[in-house]
Amino acid sequence: WFYGILGNNELDEAWIDEGFTTAQTRDYMMDRYGTIGFDWQSDEWTDKYQRKFWSFNNKLHNDQWSSINYILSGYDEPISRKSYLFKNSTSYRQNAYTKPSLMLNELKYILGDSLYYLSIQDFYKKWELKHVDEEKFIESVEKVSGKEFDWFFDAWLHDTRVMDYSIQKWHAKKNNDGTYKVFLKIKNLGNRHMPQLVETEFFDGSTERIWWENNYWNNEDEFIFDVSKKPARLSLDPDAQSLDVDYRNNSTKLKRKITFDWPGMNYKPRDKIVYTWLPSLYYNNIDSYSPGLQIRRSYGSFENQIVKLNHSLEKDPVYKKHSFYWYYEGSFKPVHNYRSFEFNFKVFDQPGLKSLKFEVNKTKFPNGYRSKPKQNYKLGFYVQSNVDTKRTNLFEPGKLSSIYFNHLMKSNYFEFETDISNSISPFSRWDFSKISFTIKFKQAKSFNSENVFRYLTGFTHAGI
């Protein structure tokens, strides 16, 4: 820990201060408390049942998800931008704290712990009690490693590139000596380049690792290497140390995590598809109870799918058979094209009602400090079949279909919503057109002494 010893201009290069602090704090907390990165066994942070049953996120993964959502939002800015030029507080926080800390983590991943910490020590010893900047840090890294790193720092500090390496295809051939030659086709779907650690997993669970380093401005390459046994699975960056935005294509078979769908648990690993399960139960007078199961598949903010299956205990008195009910809902966000869009599907056959729905959702965030409100656009349609009134009395009988548009403008002080819908003939019993406007005002005020002082004087005082 060396702050107070090295000085920097936080207006010009905030990341040199805050980025190092964030990276070192995370490294310490993960070393002290494990990959979770906080004292999760303390009653102050978690309940007993959570410690026993929940799956907790990796602290590094949390930070990576935070930055991935930001850099894919369409509002990313370079880390090296002067603090007062960032367009909003989110950009400042990401580019002063989170993104540079992840850059340093990637640097440690490439160099290895020994060279990375030697670089930090060289940086400290050479510039203690002096002012530092970007060039002085890079100089220490290149001096200790003996390699040029402009390709690495330029992309991180002065651009807003995205990295997404993928395994396109692979096969292996047995050599005469019993070893295997692997042919691995690697493709970068983004525009930021980095060496990749390739892990080969064998059928007995053992692994071998080798670096692919033909990454300089090379979007696609065939990597040929030898392994000692027949390979079962290949992975790029198996420890999820880099800010590769989508790990679903980093492995020939992505790992899975199956767990109970505990309320409030928000488990989002970077390198696993998560499956959660939950019992489901319906009841009506005809079917009696219909027990079933809900299964959810999710990966970060890119994918969320839900399937429900239920089977009635009693037979239908007319058709003389048990009823089977199902439900599917899926939400998907593209990684590269149409990043600001979300596509939602819903189709189900539930007690008394069948329906199909498709919706496109687009969110637009404000660029500046409170200059514009957040805006959300929805365009979609739904088709609802005849209602079985024997099983539900919540809907009127008859087919219903509609196309709709919704616009929500939301700030800290108000919400303004526009809702337009129109029936689709001849698929609807009712013909209608509807437009509605809703406006809500909200502003919370507290009148403690500091808020009054700030309002009257225009600045914040600090106490000791």
Identify the function of each model-found stretch.
Residues 1-185, 193, 206:
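Hydrophobic alpha-helical and helix-loop surface patches within well-folded domains
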Residues 21, 104, 153, 234, ...:
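Hydrophobic, well-ordered secondary-structure elements that form the walls
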Residues 83-84, 119, 270-276, 300-306, ...:
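Flexible, solvent-exposed coil segments and beta strand-coil junctions
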Residues 113, 148, 302-304, 336-340, ...:
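Strand-connecting loop/turn motifs
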Residues 163-236:
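Long, His/Glu/Asp-enriched segments that create or flank divalent metal/ion-associated functional microenvironments
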Residues 181-185, 197-199, 222-224, 233-235, ...:
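Beta-strand secondary-structure signal
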Residues 204-206, 224-226, 235-338, 359-368, ...:
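Outer-membrane beta-barrel initiation region
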Residues 281, 340-348, 357-361, 378-380, ...:
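C-terminal outer-membrane beta-barrel translocator/porin domains of Gram-negative envelope proteins
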